Amino acid sequence: MTSPATELLKTPLFDLHVALGARMVPFAGYSMPVQYPDGLIAEHKHTRASASLFDVSHMGQLRLVGSDAAAAFETLMPVDVIGLGVGKQRYGLLLNDEGGIMDDLMFVNTGDDLFVIVNGACKAADIAHIQNRIGQRCRVELMPDWALLALQGPQAVDALARLAPGVKKLVFMTGGAFDW
């Protein structure tokens, strides 16, 4: 929660949201759009029938770089990180020092590094934990200025394929970089 004295952070798409008439609300320390002029029901129906773009830039994005990155990251969660193939994505649970669950996260093996996405509400604590526990074994690169978008709906692949045709080859829990 954000105190009145704390200024809300803005995603890279903040100005676009405001220009499109979004109603902005505090969420995870950011000013985030909660709805647009057409209303929630229209937005929901559009997403279910076509595809909608969601700004999830409040979530934490980081890269784990180095030859020991996968082995180091695997010490923080009860999932196989070392064996994750290039272009494959995995859901994981970030554990505290006692083995309790701190948070959940997603990561993908890009071939050069691990790209990690942590939840916005716990971003600072998650990133600090990762840096403190494995920062000496691999480089932890934060990406605070990057936007993160979620494209959802039955027409999502077709919509994105118009910009980056290679995305059609992706299946569930895979990822990749595409030129457009």
Regions found by a protein language model. Name each.
Residues 1-180:
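Basic, glycine/lysine-rich polyanion-binding surfaces/domains
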